[in-house]
């Protein structure tokens, strides 16, 4: 199923760690990125802007293949 705005997702640790996106930021990715659901708020090409609502942080951009949809 295609991911669209409003979809709940979780980052895949193995695909995010060591990626170009991770290297462009702090090398220690916070656990909430992998342990809490995030909501897709925008989509541009292969990238998703994800807002993690459990913590007061700005949204982050991740490639679509670095996340998995959470079954509702």
Swiss-Prot record:
Topology relative to the lipid bilayer, per the entry, is: Peripheral membrane protein
The compartments listed are:
Cellular thylakoid membrane
List the catalytic activities from the record: a plastoquinone + NADH + (n+1) H(+)(in) = a plastoquinol + NAD(+) + n H(+)(out); a plastoquinone + NADPH + (n+1) H(+)(in) = a plastoquinol + NADP(+) + n H(+)(out)
The coiled-coil regions, if any, are none
EC number(s) in its UniProt entry? Answer: 7.1.1.-
Q: What's a Gene Ontology MF term here? A: quinone binding
Ordered alphabetically, the record's keywords are: Membrane, NAD, NADP, Plastoquinone, Quinone, Thylakoid, Translocase, Transport
Would you name any one GO CC term?
plasma membrane-derived thylakoid membrane
Enzyme class, first EC level, given as a word: translocase
Regarding protein family, the annotation reads: Belongs to the complex I NdhO subunit family.
Instruction: Kindly provide the name given to this protein in its UniProt entry.
Output: NAD(P)H-quinone oxidoreductase subunit O
Q: Taxonomically, what lineage is the organism?
A: Bacteria, Bacillati, Cyanobacteriota, Cyanophyceae, Synechococcales
């Amino acid at each position: 199923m295609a991911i669209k705005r409003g979809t709940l997702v979780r980052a895949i640790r193995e695909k995010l760690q060591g990626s170009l996106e991770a290297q462009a930021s702090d090398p220690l990715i916070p656990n909430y990125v992998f342990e809490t659901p995030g909501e897709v708020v925008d989509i541009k090409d292969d990238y998703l802007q994800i807002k993690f609502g459990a913590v007061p942080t700005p949204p982050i951009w991740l490639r679509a293949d670095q996340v998995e949809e959470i079954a509702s």
